[in-house]
Amino acid sequence: MLRPLNKSDAEFLCSIFKDNEEYYNIFFDSESEVSEWERRIEIFLKNNGIHHFIIEEEVPVGWFSYLDCPDQGEREVGILVIKKEFLYCGYGRKAFIEFFEMCKVDNIHTVFLSVNKDNDRAINFYKKLGFEIYAEETIPQCNETFNLEQYKMKLNLV
């Protein structure tokens, strides 16, 4: 279900973010074209992050990324975003179940993530998976228009 991101995925990645205004506004101030996403994907692939598409029957339905800290036995979820027409179909849960299995194989014992304090739907979803809030933080001027207020959450896998 999780497939690594590659350079040819720019068009679909762009469409996912255009469907999800909350994420789009964080990453961009104006309309971005596929060429901008091609540039971003190159940065993502060079970065320490690990990026996957969530695939169902050969169709990409979302994007899941995380940062790896194997020496500390930890991973931090970067982004989970599901394309609008595939919301509420269980794809986020399936992606996390596969992700947790990968963590166990890699001896990862703690998973962290951050979530917008106003995103009750996501907070409840993460709580159902077993995550707990352990801190709050403000990212000043996340983009030019607002500060990002978020909860830090964690899940112990052992």
Question: Where on the chain are the PLM-derived regions?
Answer:
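Active-site acidic-Proline motif in GNAT/NAT acetyltransferases
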Residues: 83-85, 89, 117-118
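Short coil/turn segments at alpha/beta junctions that flank glycine-rich nucleotide-binding fingerprints
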Residues: 89, 106-109
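Conserved active-site alpha-helix within GNAT-family acetyltransferase domains
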Residues: 93, 118-135
